[in-house]
């Protein structure tokens, strides 16, 4: 079995495949059309020689990293895992790699780990970047798509979001009309979190639409975290003169 040698060069690949160095370069950088027959031959030769293009040289030649970044404030989320699997599948299908990093937008002592210096574009999940960070990257015309978050009003950045208000409204209305519930407790997430805000808005709208007064005492803080939700509910139940409730609507899976 042929072992990879660090001394294998692009010229050797070209000679063995019977093509020019320029053709090999075009194949590696995918910046010009090459016939299917030549592409297959180069693929086979590179595999036989165990030739791996130098990433830095490839990037310099093409001005592309062929890497898509994904930035999130947390990777420990039941919702995040299936989403990540789908993103990775699409990225690889188009010949790109996926670079994943966590970053908290309140950490001003260091720049975001993903950006124009190491990716061709970026997916920003939830609160991965502050509005100021987004504005700065957008000013540099760096391609971005926001996931599970709407862009600042001043920016036209593509976004993929969930209709939180509509879904929460329908869930609460289902509890009211089908299960005849009138005292519905709501576990919200962090107060300034976008998803939490719109789910609470949908909750309140459904109560109002069905003639049920909103009772602020039935809105508890779960912080999108199971331990916090458990502690909050335990404290609520142990309280004297407990407010009656006949259903619980949680704003996330962890609280549920």
Stretches found by the model and what they are:
Residues 49, 116-118, 178-181, 236-244:
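Glycine-rich phosphate-binding loop signature in dinucleotide/nucleotide-binding domains
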Residues 21-25, 60-75, 183-190:
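Short beta-strand segments enriched in small/hydrophobic residues
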Residues 172-184:
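Glycine-rich phosphate/diphosphate-binding loops that line cofactor/substrate pockets in enzymes
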Residues 73-82, 100-109, 160-170, 186-234, ...:
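Hinge/beta->alpha junction and helix N-cap segments in small-molecule ligand-binding domains
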Residues 119-126, 183-187, 241-252:
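Periplasmic-binding protein-like
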Residues 1-5, 66-173, 238, 242:
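Alpha-helical recognition/docking segments in bacterial nutrient-uptake
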Residues 1-64:
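N-terminal helix-turn-helix DNA-binding module of bacterial transcription factors
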Residues 13, 24, 42, 68, ...:
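Hydrophobic structural packing positions in well-ordered secondary structure
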């Amino acid at each position: 079995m042929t072992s990879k040698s660090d001394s294998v060069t692009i010229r050797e690949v070209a000679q063995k495949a019977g093509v020019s160095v320029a053709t090999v370069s075009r194949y590696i950088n995918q910046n010009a059309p090459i016939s299917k027959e030549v592409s297959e031959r180069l693929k086979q030769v590179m595999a036989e020689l165990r030739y791996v293009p130098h990433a830095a040289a490839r990037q310099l030649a093409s001005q592309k990293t062929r890497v898509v970044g994904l930035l999130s404030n947390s990777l420990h989320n039941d919702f995040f895992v299936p989403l990540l699997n789908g993103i990775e599948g699409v990225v690889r299908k188009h010949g790109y790699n996926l670079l994943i990093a966590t970053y908290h937008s309140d950490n001003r002592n260091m720049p975001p780990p993903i950006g124009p210096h190491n990716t061709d574009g970026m997916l920003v999940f939830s609160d991965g970047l502050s509005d100021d960070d987004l504005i700065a990257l957008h000013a540099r015309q760096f391609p971005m798509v926001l996931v599970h978050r709407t862009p600042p009003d001043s920016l036209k950045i593509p976004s993929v979001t969930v209709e939180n208000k509509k879904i929460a409204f329908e869930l609460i209305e289902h509890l009211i009309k089908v299960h005849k519930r009138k005292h519905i407790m709501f576990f919200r997430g962090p107060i300034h979190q976008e998803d939490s805000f719109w789910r609470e808005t949908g909750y309140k709208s459904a109560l109002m639409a069905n003639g049920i007064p909103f009772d602020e005492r039935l809105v508890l803080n779960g912080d999108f975290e199971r331990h916090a939700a458990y502690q909050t509910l335990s404290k609520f139940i142990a309280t004297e003169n407990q407010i009656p409730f006949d259903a619980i609507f949680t704003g996330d899976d962890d609280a549920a």
